[in-house]
């Protein structure tokens, strides 16, 4: 009688789960089991299973069985809620060795549980499984792994050893991490970090692009400052000529007191000035050959030959086929913005009056 009542209770309660409070539904099942056992005392006939079947039937319809009403009252559930969640015109027969139900007056009678000693054990297990509500199999009790193989339906061809347990217990061993493995996990989780990101190529950010641009600008400014330094040193050398030798000073003293010599004497002084210009150009760095101007030779005056204009700082762009025009791209030296970027003052630069001597390789 205990097994048959349990099968009927599981079938009825399966309709009430997830619709009514679970705790009260459990109390409802306990009270219903207690009331059914009390009702079936003296009306249970294993020798004649169908004797007293109408008395043991539980009916829920327009009229609800008094056992259902009493169990709902004891559990604190409303009888209308219980009847509304159960199928209409539900009848459950609880007989010795068999439990069946019917939904509707003209519905088919379906067997939930049957116990026939002539059948094999596999068939009994199949009937026990079918005793639960097929529409709510999620409420089937979960057994331990040892008995889950026997309670599950047997596979065909008798391969019972290949049946896997339907429920595997979760491992109870605590998770342990070393310092290295814990550092490789995600923050707030035990999952490992994605290692695929480490193999990706680092992308260039706008900050990195800005740094490269600044470095290129600094390199350009350094090249411009070195070129202007060499050009300006060449202009000062032509304007402030080094101290001549005593013989040249004696030649210049009478010329300062006398009126300017005629044109033929100026033509005689041109070769000396050209030699001085060649010495000055040879004193430059051999790596700065692009600053040696080919049209400087053959000019009348050294200052006007290099930089034609009113003053040596009033530079005009020179025409060359393969040379880089610094002043056409960045402006003249008189512009304040260009001079400020060079980080030094051109007017305060000091140059020695000693004449540079060319280095001759043996």
Swiss-Prot record:
One of its GO terms (cellular component) is nucleus. PROSITE patterns: BTG_1, BTG_2. The keyword Nucleus applies. The modification Phosphothreonine is found at residue 204. One of its GO terms (molecular function) is transcription corepressor activity. Residues 82-92 are annotated as: Important for nuclear localization. Residues 144-160, 238-256, 265-280 have a biased composition (Low complexity). Phosphorylated on Ser and Thr residues. Residues 161-220 are annotated as: Required for interaction with CPEB3. It is found in: Cytoplasm; Nucleus. Residues 144-171, 234-284 are annotated as: Disordered. GO terms for biological process: negative regulation of BMP signaling pathway; negative regulation of cell population proliferation; negative regulation of nuclear-transcribed mRNA poly(A) tail shortening; negative regulation of osteoblast differentiation; negative regulation of translation; positive regulation of nuclear-transcribed mRNA catabolic process, deadenylation-dependent decay; positive regulation of nuclear-transcribed mRNA poly(A) tail shortening; regulation of SMAD protein signal transduction. A motif (Bipartite nuclear localization signal) lies at residues 22-39. Keywords: Cytoplasm, Nucleus, Phosphoprotein. The keyword Phosphoprotein applies. A motif (Nuclear export signal) lies at residues 228-236. Ubiquitous. InterPro entries: Anti_prolifrtn, BTG-like_sf, Tob1/2. Its main location: cytoplasm. Belongs to the BTG family. Interacts with ERBB2. Interacts with CNOT7. Interacts with CPEB3 (via C-terminal RNA-binding region); recruits CNOT7 to CPEB3 to form a ternary complex required for mRNA deadenylation and decay. Interacts with CNOT8. Interacts with CPEB4. PANTHER family: PROTEIN TOB1 (PTHR17537:SF6), TRANSDUCER OF ERBB2 TOB (PTHR17537). Anti-proliferative protein; the function is mediated by association with deadenylase subunits of the CCR4-NOT complex. Mediates CPEB3-accelerated mRNA deadenylation by binding to CPEB3 and recruiting CNOT7 which leads to target mRNA deadenylation and decay. This is Protein Tob1. It comes from Mus musculus (Mouse). The lineage of its organism: Eukaryota, Metazoa, Chordata, Craniata, Vertebrata. The gene is Tob1.
